[in-house]
Curated annotation (Swiss-Prot):
It comes from Clostridioides difficile (strain 630). Substrate binds at residues 62-64, 94, 277, 308. Keywords: Hydrolase, Metal-binding, Pyrimidine biosynthesis, Zinc. The gene is pyrC. The keyword Membrane does not apply. The keyword Ligase does not apply. This is Dihydroorotase. NCBIfam families: PRK09357.1-4 (NF006839), pyrC_multi (TIGR00857). Its EC number is 3.5.2.3. Binds 2 Zn(2+) ions per subunit. It catalyses: (S)-dihydroorotate + H2O = N-carbamoyl-L-aspartate + H(+). InterPro entries: Amidohydro-rel (IPR006680), DHOase (IPR004722), DHOase/Allantoinase_Hydrolase (IPR050138), Dihydroorotase_CS (IPR002195), Metal-dep_hydrolase_composite (IPR011059), Metal_Hydrolase (IPR032466). GO terms for cellular component: cytoplasm. Its cofactor is Zn(2+).
């Protein structure tokens, strides 16, 4: 048994926020209350000054297996997640081969059994990411797929998307969408505007996102499907999601830490380590994302953890791949830029990083109560630390060298300590 003493337990399900102890027995939260130390515990953790929260859940990561394991693999990705306080992640399907069939899905599922945290795998919406024919969603759901996404590529056939939504509604699974109309993207990875012009690039206009978000919100309203707008970056799109929710659509949006922290100006400082799709946008867009997080329009924070090798990111801007890593800095960026700046309460932040993403994928996790699975993160929200090295195979991050608040000290998954600072 493990006794966690003197911590500030924050649980978004019950709205509990109090100094109280937890006992973990086997893989469950056995008791919540006030307990004395004794020899019966194998481990006693003094969580004084720390928040004790549900293990974090990230619904948007790339662990690059199969096909690109020189960038990341399931083991290294899981360890990176554990260091960041995450106990469950959902991997995207843009691997090689693409996860669009049961064999590839089962390969990842089998490899994930040895991971230190819960690694779940989403499947593609269309075969081969070609946007022409739906995968066998029913068979894949039976195999254990929690949701479907062609993340990395936008889906352009509206009728096919409507078919997918009707099927997803029937199967009670979410569909997650990467929203960028390629015909409106001059150069990916940088916002169309002043910075793109300085770099001699056309950039990617926010309207490329807006038109796709508008379409998918309306299709979600029509079909009743549960739809996730991935890595929202445009302020106008935030307003559209808010309106779609008002109309009754089951639409959720996820924001990445880089989109609520940085702006297009940071591309000039960090170069390819600030290149991602969708790109960093204007200060106005960033402020609209923070507003959306604050008022509940954006329910989920997800990293879009996208590892690349140093050689790939060292190429010139236009040739370098898009994406940055995020698992090891996500919580601290939320604490530093949202909680400490009074945009969100600690309860709201934890909610957007645990129970809300779990609900999207119909997972019965993300909360602290007796009998629940013992997935726990223990972190000091006031401890300052400098981002220096990563557990991930990659280090493509614009936050290297930055001082952040919020240090993860323990991550416990299924009752086992999987990370200890």
């Amino acid at each position: 048994m493990i006794l966690i003493k003197n911590g500030r337990v924050i649980d978004p399900k019950s709205q509990r926020d109090e100094n109280i102890d937890l006992i973990i027995k086997e893989n469950k939260i056995y008791k919540i209350g006030k307990f004395d130390e004794s020899d019966e515990y194998e481990k006693i953790i003094d969580a004084s000054g720390n928040v004790v929260a549900p293990g974090l859940v990230d619904v948007h990561v790339h662990f690059r297996d199969p096909g690109f394991t020189y960038k990341e693999d399931i083991e290294s990705g899981a360890k990176s997640a554990a260091r960041g306080g995450f106990t469950t992640v959902i991997c995207m399907a843009n691997t090689n081969p693409i996860v669009d069939n049961e064999d590839t899905f089962n390969y990842v599922k089998e490899k994930s059994k040895n991971a230190c945290i819960n690694v779940l795998q989403a499947a593609a919406i269309t075969k081969g990411f070609e946007g022409k024919e739906l995968v066998d969603m029913e068979a894949l759901k039976k195999a254990g797929v929690p949701g479907f996404t062609d993340d990395g590529l936008p889906l352009m056939d509206s009728n096919l998307i409507m078919e997918a939504m009707i099927k997803a509604k029937e199967l009670d699974v979410p569909l997650s969408f990467h929203e960028e109309d390629p015909s409106l993207v001059g150069n990916p990875g940088v916002n169309a505007g002043k910075v793109a012009s300085e770099l001699g690039l056309k950039g990617a206009s926010s309207v490329a996102e807006d038109v796709m978000v508008a379409r998918d919100c309306m299709l979600a309203l029509k079909t009743g499907a549960k739809v996730d707008i991935q890595h929202i970056s445009s302020g106008v799109s935030v307003d559209m999601v808010r309106f779609a929710k008002y109309l009754g659509a089951t639409v959720v949006a996820e924001a990445s830490p880089h989109h609520f922290t940085l702006t297009e100006e940071d591309v000039l400082e960090f170069g390819t380590n600030a290149k991602m799709n969708p790109p960093l946008r204007s200060k106005w867009d960033r402020d609209k994302i923070i507003e959306g997080l604050n008022d509940g329009t954006i329910e989920i924070i997800a990293t879009d953890h996208a590892p690349h090798s140093k050689e790939e990111k060292d190429r010139e801007f236009i040739k370098a791949p898009s994406g940055i890593i995020g698992l090891e800095t996500s919580l601290a960026l939320g604490i530093t830029n949202l909680v400490h700046k009074n945009h969100l309460s600690m309860m709201q932040l934890i909610e957007k990083m645990s129970i809300n993403p779990a609900k999207l994928y119909n997972l019965n996790i993300g909360f602290i109560e007796e009998g629940a699975v013992a997935d726990i993160v223990i972190f000091n929200p006031e401890e300052e630390w400098t981002v220096e090295s990563f557990v991930s195979k990659a280090d493509n991050s614009p936050f290297k060298g930055k001082s952040l608040y919020g240090k993860v000290n323990y991550t416990i998954c299924n009752g086992e300590i999987v990370y200890n600072a």
